[in-house]
A protein has these predicted regions:
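Non-catalytic C-terminal accessory region of glycerolipid acyltransferases
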Residues: 73-169
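Catalytic core of membrane glycerolipid acyltransferases/transacylases, capturing the structured
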Residues: 5-73, 77, 87-104
């Protein structure tokens, strides 16, 4: 409602594992309220941008590869940037913690907002964790496989949900 004009860092919690229906819903609602004159730019994980068909869709909807450099450039150009600091750790939190916000100690978004002198707009997304059950976060497996270094992931979760069935990611 009362979001400032000009650049801002929109900070939200990350839900729903490998789906991205909530960010799509946020973007659609923002568009209905603000139109094309004040669009959102979502920072997305490298793995999402690496998939050719998905990359095309993401780019067309204003998404960009998540990096400090990209966020800096967008904010300096007066854009609104959406970040989900909790990343995979939060997206794949156990079902019993579905209503908890888990940023995992990540505070880079605060430093970014201070450095660029832009406001932080908090956003809370709920409902995504109602569509699937994280049976195990797989943090230890991710650590053993060095996934944080290889693909910037702190989890290798085991989950159950539609339409995926039993999966991991």
């Amino acid at each position: 409602e009362n979001v400032t004009k000009g650049p801002a860092l929109v900070v939200g919690n990350h839900n729903a594992g490998i789906t991205f229906l909530e960010p799509i819903g946020l973007g659609a609602r923002w568009y209905l309220e603000k139109g094309l004159n004040d669009t959102l730019h979502f920072l997305v994980h490298d793995a999402m941008v690496a998939l050719p068909l998905l990359r095309t869709f993401l780019i067309r909807t204003g998404c960009v590869r998540a990096s400090h450099e990209t966020a800096n450039k967008l904010l300096q150009r007066g854009k609104k940037v959406v970040v989900f600091p909790g990343g995979n750790l939060e997206a794949f939190r156990p079902y019993k913690n579905r209503y908890k916000i888990t940023f995992g100690g990540k505070k880079g978004f605060i430093r970014l907002a201070l450095r660029e002198q832009v406001p932080i707009v908090p956003v809370v997304l709920v409902g995504g964790h109602e569509t699937f059950f994280v049976l195990h976060d797989g943090a230890r497996i991710a650590e053993l496989l060095k996934l944080k270094k290889l693909v910037r992931s702190e989890t290798c979760a085991l989950f159950l949900g539609l339409p995926w069935g039993l999966g991991f990611g």
